[in-house]
Structures are given as C-alpha cells and as structure tokens.
Amino acid sequence: KFRYADLAIARYEDAYNAQLQKSSGKLEDLEKQYYPCINVAFMHYVFHDEKKAHEYAKAAREICRKIRVKGGESYWIQATEAEASLILGQVGPALEAYAQAVGMEDAKPSYVASTRKQALQIASLIEDKEVKGEVEKAFPLMGIVACSGHVIDNPGRDRRFPPEAEMVAKEKIEQALDKLGATCGFSSAACGTDILFLETMAERGGETHVFLPFAKEEFIETSVRRAGGNWVSRFESVLDHATSVHYVTNEGYYGDDSLFSLCNQVMLGFAAMRGRGLDEDPNLLVIWDGKPGSTGGTGELVEAWRGEFNEPEVIDPREILPSLSDSEPVPVYSGETRPAFLSESGESESSIRSIKTMLFADVQAFSQVMEEKTAEFVEIFHGGIAKMLERLPREPAFVNTWGDSFFVVFDELEDALKLALEIRDYFNYGEWGDLLSEGVMEVRISMHAGPVYEEFDPILKKRNFFGRHVNQAARIEPIVLPGSVFVSETVAALISFGYDDYDFEYAGNLELAKDFGSYPIYMLQRRGYSGEKSD
C-alpha cells in the first residue's frame, strides 16, 4: 500500500511542479496549481508526514487567496482553502470556510459530498476526536436513495398498482424524497415505481443511476412495454437524462429471472458503495404491498436491505387504492406481457446460465524460475493453493491450472474473496527468492462476477464455464499490480452490500488486456487494512 501511495504522491508533485514552472502568475495558471498542490498535502497528511503536509497546505491556501484576489471565486477554491486550514490544524477557520463553500451558488451536492468525505478523513487523524463531529455538522448529507417497487398492473390482474394510481404514487414519492433529502438516486427502470422515481429525481435536479439486468431492448419487452401508453418513451427519456446507466449483462434475458435478483444486489451495492465512500448511510424507498413476491421482486430486495441497513421508507399501494374508487380506469393499450423472444414453454432458447464469481491468478517472474526448481515451484504454487481450497467451506464449481496460472469458479462470492486474499498473502509474505534466477515472485489475482454459461467440456471431460463475464475476469488479470487483487466494479458493489469483512480502493478506469475496453477497477483488501477500526 505504501509503495502505491508513494507513486501517487510523486504523480501529484510532478503535476504541481510542472504547473509552477509554466506559471506566469495569471489567473488561468493559478487555477491549474491549487488542485495538485492540495492533493499532495492531503496525501502527505494521511501518510503521517506532517511537515510536508503543512508545507503544501500553506502553498495551496496562498494560491487560493491569490485566485480570489484576481476574481476567481468558486466552490472548489473555497473548499480547498478550508481543507488547507484543516490540515494545518486551524479548525475554526476551516469550519468557517467549509460553511461558506457549502452555501455557494455552484456547490453541487456531488461536490459537497466529495469534500465532506475528504474532510472527515483528515478530521479522523486529528488528536482531538471532537473535531470529526464538528466537521460532520458543517456539511449536509448527500441524500442517497435506492428505489424499487411494483410495476404497473398487467391487464386482468387484481388491482395492486393500476395505471390510474400513477399521479397519487408520484405525489407520495415526492413527499418521501423531500423527507429523505434525496439528491442521488439508484434504481432500475421498469414501468411504474422505477420510472416515476427517476423522473421525480430528475425534476429535483438530482443524480440518477440506472441499472438494467440485461439487454435494453429485451428489458423494454419484459418490464416496460407491458403497461402500454407512453411508458417506453418515458423509459428512453430517463435513460437519456441519467447520470449513469449500468448493465448487469449486455446479453439477453432468456427467461432467466436470477438476473433481476443480481441487478437488485448490484444496484443496492452501488448505493451502499456511494454511502460507504461518503461515510453516509443510504436509504431505500419502495412502493410495496408487504408480500414476499417473486424472484428478483421488491419483497426479496426489502428483506436483503433490512439485513444490512435501516428500515426502508415504504409507500403501501393498498393505501392509495381507496382514493381511486370513484376514478375511471385508465385504458391500457397493450395486453401482451409475454416477451416475443421466449418459446411457448417458457424455456430459454439458449444454454443455461448461472451467476458465478470467477478468479484468475498467475505468478509474475514465472519465467525466471530455475529449471531444476520446477518441482519445488509446483509444490509451492499448486500445493499451497490446494491446501487453501481444502479449507474453504464449499467446494468450488470448477478449478483448472496451466503452468503458473490458476482459474477457479465459485457459487459463493464469500469463498472467492477469502481465497483471493489467502493466495495474495501466501505469496507476499513467503520467501521464494531461492527459486528464481532473478526478480521477485509475486502473484496477480483478478475477480469478476456475472452470468456465465455452464457446458460440458469434451477436452477436460467435465463441465466448464464460458462467456463474456469469464473473459472479463481473465482480461483484468494481466493489468493487476503484482502482489495485489483487482476486482471489477460489480464485485466491489456486491462487497459493499453484505460483506463487512472486506474493503477496496479505487484503482482507476483501466484499459483491460486484449482490447477488452476500459472499466472501473478496484483493489481488494480486508476491512481495517488502513488502520480503520472495524465495527
């Protein structure tokens, strides 16, 4: 960790010094200096080099004051000056500056949330523990809300969320969002609750993060067009205006309801991940009749949420229906609820998929293993991992090795997380220098989760796993920093919702191997690795 911290500090210092060399003292030059300067100060402070932290904090504050004199007032200038004062231990001036920043016209909720996170990190390192509480009071919460709920009723079913209930439901959503102070929303985009929530969040000027379980066109057929009317155009509109759109998989539905469950888990995980980064508990808003429901439904989601967080904010549709008793039903123009791409029997037209976690590992400097030490390497690498596999509570779904590489598929994410960190520690803390002609033997480990195809492999004579999500896990592995575990954003989200023993750091939006594309990648750690007290 400290090795990568040194690299980050050096990068910010290089950026700051480069701007200093080019500076002519003009406003546009100063505006390029304060950001790398305060980041160097923050990094030095976090890694306990107070002298350098103070040096850069003073420089950053002076740059901000010069910018202000030249008429360059902005939220970030004010927030940077506040952070510099806090690093310097000047708590009173820092709190005053933070309050001024939060009240500025260009203070967007996402800006304030980011500033709050960094301020709390600094405050947690100050000897006087009351300072953190004072800093918390200087900022409003972001108001993170995940939402789910019933879709508009299919024609002919018992009334639960009929089309004519839409306006009353929207009013109740507006009231709930006011109560929760919502500025950041997470939801899928089915007709009914989801789209109403996303539209209302957009009207409030909030962020909207949309999650779809599979390909867009098939989602429209399963979960939007069924309601008739203008729901499809409204679906397109909320996606067009969304802050982000995430797909659990870009493939089709194929009658696989487990994708709805995974989508719920990922969506709640993203909300939890946002709250985790900001030291803020997210909230859940649902339109729900209190019944368990089907796979991937609202009842399943509420049960999972209650196991991890607070009580959800529930809008009961049964309380809406009495107000509609004298209303004329709104006509529904589409009675077709069965997706055209499913067979009459309801079976998938494709092979069976299942949700799995994939782990790839290989050893850096394997080519430097001395020939006469090959048998010893096999005992260390294969033998060591074999013992770890025996200690797992469940047998993996699949294991394969070739040379210095290792591939394993898990039914349970917990098993993959446990094994990944055990392998990492086994290599990081072992003494393997005698095996190599030169270099250091370190392991690279990658993980991803998603729906994969399970097929009989005629070469291995046993079942094997295939598909894009297997490929994605494999393409992460070559870019892993030696001695580390890199995981996909999906895994990071799942960790955030229900895996309290694990943590992660954002590594960046990285280009994966073999032109697979750029993806957000995270470095897996155990909870408390940074000195943070575990609850």
Language-model features: where?
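Boundary/linker segments of alpha-helical solenoid repeat arrays
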Residues: 22-24, 28-30, 64-73, 105-117
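"A position-specific structural signal for the A-helix of alpha-solenoid helical repeats
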Residues: 39, 80-87, 117-118
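TPR/TPR-like (Sel1-like) alpha-helical repeat modules
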Residues: 58-62, 91-109
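Regulatory cytosolic signal-relay segments
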Residues: 321-354, 379
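Catalytic NTP-binding/metal-coordinating core of nucleotidyl cyclase/transferase enzymes
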Residues: 345-426
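Catalytic beta-strand-to-alpha-helix segment of the class III nucleotidyl cyclase homology domain
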Residues: 408-531
